[in-house]
């Protein structure tokens, strides 16, 4: 379908021919017309191990060589983006350099930061997680060196021929022989786009992919091209999307046995020494086997095949027993994986991802716990993880990370503690599950194992070991972690049907509503023309001061005054497309009327104060707690508001006080609030992606709000000066989910009202004790201490009473079994003590205590009489229910007038059970 796309003038001018690979059947371009294979693994094994392709370079040297080369070719070098894709709402991690420019640049909404540009972008992909360390080439975290050009009808930068020419020139500049290079045709599809691409292969290794993104799913007037059953249409932009693997270039320049030896020499050596394998680094036989293994391990694809089967193939090819290869290679593969994972965690945590059980935090915890599991296999202490991550951060360069390394270490230490707790608790959960499936004579399903990991954090290896010891059967796929990562790699897009969408077609002919709330934020009254009324309930004006619900801020309410002098209540305001709808409560508003709108001033001012205070609190929390603080949600209200923030531990009372003090100092500084519409690309380059605390707004221009150091893209209404807020009072902090803390607060008059409420509570409490407020802490402590002592005395007396009652109780003998059925108005613990005193001797007891409700305890020392059955009968008479074990059950009911009837029913049940 795309064959014509690869007929490049550059290929022809350089004398390349198009051949078909005898192994995979795919087309490729080569300078050697006699070449039969494409040069990709597994069609061709690695040729560069021990025989480097490029001049030897380190990671830093290779990166600089690449970026400098493209700068000399007219490209602008730009800084890397974070690995946490804060500017995207569809993915959590930056998976490619082009992801930096999606969706707004690639769709043509905004211009690129430079054109053409070059970048070396750290990326994280976890879809091959189980292959890392084993294949010799897979990484979770890698740098995608890239050059991008964005071509339009108005401006052509360069396209396919120049892209391939630049690739050839780069490879040659690094010392490669062009005659060895092949370009393999590979139609590319991803993220709703498509286009031709070529894989750049040399020495059996794919070192780059050159994608020519020119097709999209959005329908245009031009005819579509069908790919994999889906029609794709020519895009407005034609984008050069290249990806050169930095680590693969370094590997090919050194010819080392694996990519890990080339990229992480210091870390591999360090971890090998720590694990007791340091001597192997100087063992020539080991190095030889490692190199031979790496050549064929390039064929390994963990998905679809078992590790053991693949290991057998490699062992056979290099001529050693499988068990010997496994014993030699497996621990080293774990070392490689640990080194890779700790670099991945350095970027994740250094770029302010907080481990949790959701979103990007889930993925960080997944990698972290997998690392700990492998460390334990090598007998490396858990505490060593923090040291390894710190070493990686220093190698990369601490200045390249936003997060303070000390905070990273604290996060890691806490995650290690959580992992230990999970492992301890998980054992009991797994044992129960194993017993269940053992009784069924069934294998534990994979779904159950996934649930154990997803919901409880219990690793699959632990499940297998414990379940096997219990006699249950577990069959784990070798790509378990890759499957889990793929399940959580993308944001779930839930789009609820908005009933107002039915109005969109009717709104299409109307002009955009003029937003007076931006032009005159301090005004509370305005005049406007009624353009449309939907179903007598939703009014569209030509302009409005009413702010529509959005960004966690409720829509404004107020009044309309009609030309007839009638007052109409505005209950809510909603934005739909480019129009603003005012929901009215009855009233006679006519199309074409000029109405007067009046906002509920107190409510609007309160919402403005709370919205501005939200920005200030977020900034204060970041100042007190660390750079990782990121908004996880917010809701503004008239009387109180809340903001959810990502944090790795519970906020302490002392930290809460500091946040409140910092916030109020910012209020008292009375700084001006700056609001301006800016080009998205310019704003991102100036302020970073902390702009998108409240989500990613659409459009080429975004409304940037600067409040006391906090800078965000925000559509809400704000105070002109921080001093207009008055004061901020934090009401409470709540742990809403793992890794998320909620601050509830009040601002302005609402904060004063909250303070008054707190004072009222204190005064009423002081009055109850007949003391001054200042004496309340000491007095309440004294009363509490006295109450505890009195409770102990009461418990002693109750225990003594129950002992005396037990001695004086007369039981009834039914067929040689002592039965006690009686009302005893004692606390529950004493009722249980009396009842079990009877059942311990083989008897049966039914005891009921009165009060506001009836309380029942049944205890049975007879297998033929289950306490749970008896209590159901007794409690049913009382209008309640109960339950428990066969030997002891408790319950009750609200109808205390039926206690005697309930006792009689219970006794009758026992007599029947004992055949009396």
From Swiss-Prot:
It comes from the Archaea. The keyword Isomerase does not apply. Its cofactor is Zn(2+). The keyword Cell inner membrane does not apply. Binds 1 zinc ion per subunit. It catalyses: tRNA(Ala) + L-alanine + ATP = L-alanyl-tRNA(Ala) + AMP + diphosphate. Belongs to the class-II aminoacyl-tRNA synthetase family. Consists of three domains; the N-terminal catalytic domain, the editing domain and the C-terminal C-Ala domain. The editing domain removes incorrectly charged amino acids, while the C-Ala domain, along with tRNA(Ala), serves as a bridge to cooperatively bring together the editing and aminoacylation centers thus stimulating deacylation of misacylated tRNAs. This is Alanine--tRNA ligase. It comes from Methanospirillum hungatei JF-1 (strain ATCC 27890 / DSM 864 / NBRC 100397 / JF-1).
């Amino acid at each position: 379908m795309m064959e014509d796309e690869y007929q490049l003038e550059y290929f022809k001018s350089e004398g390349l021919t198009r051949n078909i690979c005898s192994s995979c059947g795919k087309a490729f371009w080569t300078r050697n017309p006699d070449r039969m294979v494409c040069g990709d693994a597994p069609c061709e094994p690695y040729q560069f191990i021990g025989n480097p392709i490029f001049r030897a370079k380190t990671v830093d040297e290779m990166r600089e060589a690449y970026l400098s080369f493209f700068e000399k070719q007219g490209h602008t070098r730009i800084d890397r983006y974070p690995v946490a894709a804060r500017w995207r709402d569809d993915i959590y991690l930056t998976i490619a350099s082009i992801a930096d420019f999606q969706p707004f640049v690639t769709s043509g909404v905004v211009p690129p930061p430079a054109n053409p540009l070059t970048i070396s972008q750290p990326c994280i992909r976890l879809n091959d997680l189980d292959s890392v360390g084993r294949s010799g080439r897979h990484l979770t975290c890698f740098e995608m060196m890239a050059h991008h050009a964005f071509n339009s009808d108005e401006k052509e930068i360069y396209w396919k021929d120049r892209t391939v020419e630049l690739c050839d020139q780069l490879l040659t500049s690094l010392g490669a022989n062009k005659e060895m290079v092949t370009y393999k045709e590979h139609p590319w599809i991803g993220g709703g786009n498509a286009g031709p691409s070529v894989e750049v292969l040399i020495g059996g290794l794919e070192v780059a992919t050159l994608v020519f993104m020119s097709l999209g799913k959005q329908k245009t007037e031009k005819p579509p091209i069908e790919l994999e059953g889906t029609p794709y249409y020519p895009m407005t932009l034609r984008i050069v999307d290249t990806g050169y693997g930095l680590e693969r270039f370094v590997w090919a320049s050194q010819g080392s046995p694996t990519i890990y030896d080339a990229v992480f020499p210091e870390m591999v050596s360090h971890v090998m020494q720590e694990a007791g394998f340091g001597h192997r680094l100087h063992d020539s036989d080991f190095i030889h086997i490692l190199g031979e293994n790496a050549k064929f391990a390039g064929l390994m694809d963990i998905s679809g095949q078992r590790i053991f089967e693949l290991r057998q193939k490699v062992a056979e090819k290099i001529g050693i027993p499988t068990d010997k290869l496994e014993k030699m290679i497996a621990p080293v593969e774990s070392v490689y994986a640990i080194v890779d994972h700790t670099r991945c965690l350095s970027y994740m945590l250094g770029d302010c991802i907080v481990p949790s059980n959701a979103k990007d935090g889930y993925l960080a915890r997944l990698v972290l716990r997998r690392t700990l599991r492998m460390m334990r296999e090598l007998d490396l202490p858990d505490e060593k993880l923090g040291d390894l991550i710190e070493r990686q951060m220093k190698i990369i360069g601490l200045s390249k990370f936003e997060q303070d390394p000390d905070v990273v270490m604290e996060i890691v230490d806490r995650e290690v503690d959580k992992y230990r707790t999970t492992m301890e608790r998980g054992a009991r959960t797994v044992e129960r599950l194993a017993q269940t499936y053992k009784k069924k004579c069934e294998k534990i399903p994979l779904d159950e194992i996934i649930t154990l990991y997803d919901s409880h954090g219990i690793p699959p290896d632990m499940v297998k070991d414990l379940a096997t010891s219990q006699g249950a059967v577990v069959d784990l796929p070798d790509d378990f972690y890759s499957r889990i990562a793929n399940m959580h790699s993308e944001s779930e897009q839930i789009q609820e049907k908005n009933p107002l969408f039915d109005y969109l077609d009717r709104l299409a002919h109307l002009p955009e509503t003029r937003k007076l709330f931006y032009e005159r934020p301090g005004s509370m009254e305005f005049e406007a023309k009624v353009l449309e009324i939907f179903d007598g309930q939703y009014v569209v004006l030509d302009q409005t001061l009413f702010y529509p619900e959005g960004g966690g801020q409720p829509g404004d309410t107020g009044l309309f005054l009609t030309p007839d002098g009638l007052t109409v209540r505005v209950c809510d305001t909603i934005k739909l497309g480019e129009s603003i709808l005012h929901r009215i409560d009855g009233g006679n508003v006519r199309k074409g009327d000029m109405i007067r709108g009046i906002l509920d001033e107190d409510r609007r001012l309160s919402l403005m104060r709370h919205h501005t205070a939200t920005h200030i609190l977020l900034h204060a929390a970041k100042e007190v707690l660390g750079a990782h603080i990121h908004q996880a949600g917010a809701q503004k209200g008239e009387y109180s508001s809340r903001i959810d923030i990502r944090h790795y531990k519970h906020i302490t009372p002392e930290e809460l006080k500091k946040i409140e003090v910092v916030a109020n100092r910012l209020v008292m500084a009375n700084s001006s609030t700056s609001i301006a519409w800016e080009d998205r690309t310019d704003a991102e380059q100036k302020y970073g992606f902390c702009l998108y605390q409240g989500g990613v707004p659409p459009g080429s221009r975004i409304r940037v709000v600067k409040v006391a150091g906090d800078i965000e893209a925000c559509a809400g209404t704000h105070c002109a000066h921080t001093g207009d807020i008055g004061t901020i009072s934090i009401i409470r902090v709540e742990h809403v989910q793992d890794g998320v803390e909620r601050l509830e607060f009040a601002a302005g008059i609402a904060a004063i009202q909250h303070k008054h409420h707190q004072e009222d509570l204190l005064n009423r409490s002081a009055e109850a004790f007949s003391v001054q407020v200042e004496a309340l802490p000491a007095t309440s402590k004294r009363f509490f201490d006295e109450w505890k002592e009195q409770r102990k005395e009461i418990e002693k007396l109750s225990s003594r009473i129950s002992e005396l009652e037990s001695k004086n109780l007369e039981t009834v003998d039914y067929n040689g079994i002592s039965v006690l059925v009686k009302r005893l108005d004692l606390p529950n613990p004493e009722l249980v003590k009396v009842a079990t005193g009877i059942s311990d001797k083989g008897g049966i007891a039914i005891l009921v205590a009165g009060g506001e409700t009836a309380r029942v305890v049944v205890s049975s020392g007879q297998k033929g009489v289950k306490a749970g059955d008896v209590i159901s009968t007794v409690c049913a008479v009382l209008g309640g229910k109960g339950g428990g074990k066969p030997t002891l059950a408790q319950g009750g009911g609200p109808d205390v007038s039926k206690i005697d009837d309930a006792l009689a029913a219970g006794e009758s049940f026992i007599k029947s059970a004992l055949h009396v």
